[in-house]
Amino acid sequence: MSDLYEKTYNPDVLSCLANLSNDEVFTPPEIVNQMLDMLPESIWNDPEATFLDPACKSGVFLREIAKRLDKGLEPIIPDREERIEHIFKEQLYGIAITELTSLLSRRSVYCSKYPNCKYSIVEFDSAEGNIQFHRCEHTWINDRCKYCGASKSEYDRDTSLETYAYEFIHINDPKDVLPMKFDVIVGNPPYQLSDGGGTGSSAKPIYQHFVDQAKKLNPRYLAMIIPSRWFSGGKGLDKFRSEMLSDDRLSRLVDFENFRDVFPGVDLAGGACYFLWDRNHHG
């Protein structure tokens, strides 16, 4: 499978994508692999392990996971066609953040934006495959979204425009989005929304909601890359900071002082970090 991806993308198009904005940032493949390296090697030999990216933008996390599973499961499922079918249909799942990124993710993962056609690596019954996108709306209470805190004046939009109401965090119980258990949840969630006062340091962070929702699913492992500004709290991050620092399941934290060291061309103050949360770690 890795050789197929290399033939399809040479050079790797996912290392060349322009970011959607400073808030929705594509993850370079090398950073994705650094994050996946934090997981135990045994996970790649487990045909029962399930993986979820709850904030698919380019599909790079699922694609790199697929490469590792293809290699790791070879002794267990020697027939490659059967192995690939199993990996894509039974192990890899994604929730896209927009309709556009759902198509891009499917193109990256399945080599076809419509995985129910003959050009897909694996042919599904549906046009979504295992990477879904369902348009959501904000739930307004006193001019703020009850889930993400978005400003009604900024995001109460015409139906033809993007709502930025991300499915994974606009619901009380994330099990209602995908009613199944996941061993690994991994991704790079959207970072912030304009709160009516500007962007950058004055924008409202939302990445913490993705982390909190992922924890509700109680995976074996959770790995995400997010801005480091939560280290100092403020801007609605005090509770998140306190919970992260007191959570003994946080087994690893890698920090980059300069955001551009991870995401070239992206200007966000405070740096970036990625972490591994291990359900069975108590340190």
Language-model-derived ranges and their functions:
Residues 2-262, 271, 278-283:
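SAM-dependent methyltransferase catalytic region
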